[in-house]
UniProtKB/Swiss-Prot annotation:
InterPro entries in UniProt: Glutathione_peroxidase, Thioredoxin-like_sf
Single GO biological process annotation from the record: cellular response to oxidative stress
Molecular function terms, GO-annotated: peroxidase activity
EC number: 1.-.-.-
PROSITE patterns per the UniProt record, alphabetical: GLUTATHIONE_PEROXID_3
Similarity comment text for this entry: Belongs to the glutathione peroxidase family.
Protein name as annotated: Glutathione peroxidase homolog BsaA
Organism superkingdom: Bacteria
Amino acid sequence: MSIYDIAVENYDGSTYLLKRYKGKVLIIVNTATNCTLNDQFNKLEMLYKKYHKYGLEILSFPCNDFNNQEPGLIKDIYRVYKYKFGITFPIHAKINVNGEHEHPLYTLLKCKQPGLFGSQIKWNFTKFVVDQQGNIVKRFLPCDNPNQMEKLIRQLLK
């Protein structure tokens, strides 16, 4: 299965296939507003503003899998992302990234780029970089600053 065959749901309930991003470099990240790592929203947004015009897309997937750090309804989460954090990149419906109900996207991401200690997502803000052909090229840890991805993003966009 290709990443482009996977359907995802937008914050508004509409669904689409990831094939709409063929030819783009993607950063896919599970996010949470109440996480202590939420300062990464600003850094991700800066990358998005800098490289979006060259073909970068950042896909945010709110996730409540870790310590109830993303409770609430997606309509409320969307407002916080937009108005508190100033996010302009795509925000999706809440998903599970581990376990029995994990989203197929995360099943694929973890299969192609397992972590250091197994395939489970350990925390919010685990970041995956996907190239223009749909290859999942690198997994970044939650504690990795999004700016650490910039060199790879530049290389892929050339």
